[in-house]
From Swiss-Prot:
Consists of three domains: the N-terminal catalytic domain, the anticodon-binding domain and the C-terminal extension. Disulfide bonds: none annotated. GO terms for biological process: prolyl-tRNA aminoacylation. Keywords: Aminoacyl-tRNA synthetase, ATP-binding, Cytoplasm, Ligase, Nucleotide-binding, Protein biosynthesis. Belongs to the class-II aminoacyl-tRNA synthetase family. ProS type 3 subfamily. This is Proline--tRNA ligase. GO terms for cellular component: aminoacyl-tRNA synthetase multienzyme complex; cytoplasm. InterPro entries: aa-tRNA-synt_IIb, aa-tRNA-synth_II, aa-tRNA-synth_II/BPL/LPL, Anticodon-bd, Anticodon-bd_dom_sf, Pro-tRNA-ligase_IIa, Pro-tRNA-ligase_IIa_arc-type, Pro-tRNA_ligase_II_C. It comes from the Bacteria. Its main location: cytoplasm. Its EC number is 6.1.1.15. Homodimer.
Length: 488
């Protein structure tokens, strides 16, 4: 079955697309750039939703839903915002057989319509902070699309908060950044760098943008999440003011932040192999698949099925997410490969020998088939729990080791330093930690000559001394340590 998946080394793009389709995560729709998220793919998104939704509520956020149709005039109120998004707008000019007085934009993001509503809801300091999250779909007319990574329509969550002070809004922005980081590392087993974006790379309409950056197996970076400090920009555009405790009218400060179904693409590209998808246990919709190994005799098969059902019952009672594959028409090998395609963390095989020994045979998805072993039914629950926990940790360690091996530090030490930097980025990719003067010109030249962008000014290296350090391109005094990478 794995013969149907392209080699990662030979054709990474096809390997990725093969997994999307063979694991039945998504399929192409009749609309260019739009995908159909299939039930298994959606079950992963549902798991992401349930975990993050709980975390948002724990930090004081409530869910709401705002219209998908946004008056064009709303977007014109914030110049930087419309300039940044207008090339991606999908606009409705006719409806009900008539031309609309004002065109409507299909939601590219919701800042404008939400802040229009906030102007009605926020009047006093008692109304603050206002912390709302929305689970929704978004339309951005992308020219080059790829399932989950970049599509015309995608699913996401977007948080929008209003605060009395700049300090509170910034605190919120960084709080959510940390929520995202912990989620990526603790649940998705993806090591990430977090940090501030350059002015050139920030969100349209933001004062500052912070991002979560991960490294894929092809050594390209993926922006997995963003959190924006919006300052007073949208409050002023929509005249959102509150009366403070002293009776003075003031504009409110804002943040917005979001993640999308792009996370499913990240899961594929960080962990998977040429057998198919590999899912970290904490995010897998199904943690365990039980596969009975049938024989030709019906009487023996009934015993195998009864025993398998007992195994499933034991695991479900212990609150594991478990399924059983009872397909008698398919060979065990086919069903093993099917489970591997789907990335189910643990496979339990039940054959006649297992029944005789009161045992089961167990194998982890991230291990070679030769590492399968038998365990007694008495120790099933405890052993499965240990293996799931171990797999979660091992996947993170493996991804972290890969990132460490592919994060290079290149600083200016002579006239050939930039040429070395350029050659490394072009030939090897990965993250490159270097120094930057903060100049837009240097940033653009590096981007044009290497196709690498500043992913972020990473928090991990903030404490490093910049004394004597110079910009990798122009040799002027360095202001920041930055991460460069080619990206999706």
């Amino acid at each position: 079955m794995s013969d149907f998946i392209a080699s990662k080394e030979d054709d990474y793009s096809k390997w990725y697309l093969d997994i999307v389709q063979k694991a039945k995560l998504a399929d192409y729709s009749p609309v260019k750039g739009c995908m159909v998220i299939m039930p298994y793919g959606y079950s992963i998104w549902s798991k992401i939703q349930s975990i993050l939704d709980k975390k948002f509520k724990e930090t004081g956020h409530e869910n709401a839903y705002f219209p998908m149709l946004i008056p064009y005039g709303f977007l014109e109120k914030e110049k930087d915002h419309i300039d940044g998004f207008s090339p991606e707008f999908a606009i409705i000019k006719d409806a009900g057989g008539e031309s609309l007085v004002e065109p409507l934009v299909l939601r590219p993001t919701s800042e404008t319509i939400i802040w229009n509503m906030y102007s009605k809801w926020i009047k006093s300091y008692r109304d603050l902070p206002l912390k709302i999250n929305q689970w929704a779909n978004v339309i951005r007319w992308e020219k080059r699309t790829r399932p989950f990574l970049r599509t015309t329509e995608f699913l996401w969550q977007e948080g929008h908060t209003a605060h009395a002070t700049e300090e509170e809004a910034l605190e919120e922005t960084l709080l959510i950044l940390d929520v995202y980081k912990r989620f990526m590392e603790d649940y998705l087993a993806i090591p990430v760098f977090c940090g501030k974006k350059s002015e050139n790379e920030k969100f349209a309409g933001a004062v500052s943008t912070y991002s979560v950056e991960a490294l894929m197996q092809d050594k390209k970076a993926l922006q997995a999440a963003t959190s924006h400090y919006l300052g007073l920009n949208f409050a002023k555009a929509f005249d959102v003011k509150f009366q403070d405790k002293d009776g003075k009218m003031k504009h409110v400060f804002a943040s917005s932040w979001g993640v999308s179904t792009r996370l499913i693409g990240a899961l594929i590209m960080v962990h998977s192999d040429e057998k198919g998808l590999i899912l970290p246990p904490r995010i897998a919709p199904v943690e365990i698949i039980v596969i009975p190994i049938f024989k030709k005799e019906d009487e023996i098969n009934k015993k195998i099925l009864d025993y398998s059902d007992c195994v499933v019952h034991t695991l479900k009672k212990a609150e594991f997410r478990v399924e059983i594959d009872k397909d008698v028409r398919s060979s065990p090998g086919f069903r093993f490969s099917s489970a591997e395609f789907k990335g189910i963390p643990i496979r339990i095989e039940v054959g006649i020998n297992d029944i005789l020994l009161n045992s089961v045979t167990i194998i982890r998805r991230d291990k070679d088939r030769k590492f399968k072993y038998q365990i007694s039914l008495d120790s099933l629950v405890s052993k499965v729990r240990v293996e799931l926990d171990s797999m979660q940790k091992d996947l993170f360690k493996k991804a972290l080791n890969f990132r460490t091996l592919n994060t290079k530090e290149i600083f200016r030490s002579g006239k050939d330093s930039y040429e070395l930097f350029k050659a490394y980025v072009n030939d090897y990719s990965g993250f490159v930690l270097s120094c930057w003067c903060g100049g837009l010109n240097c940033e653009n030249i590096i981007k044009n000559e290497t196709k690498a962008t500043i992913r972020c000014i990473p928090d991990d290296f903030k404490a490093r001394d910049l004394t004597g350090m110079t910009c990798i391109y122009c040799s002027s005094k360095a202001k920041y340590y930055v991460l460069f990478a080619k990206s999706y």
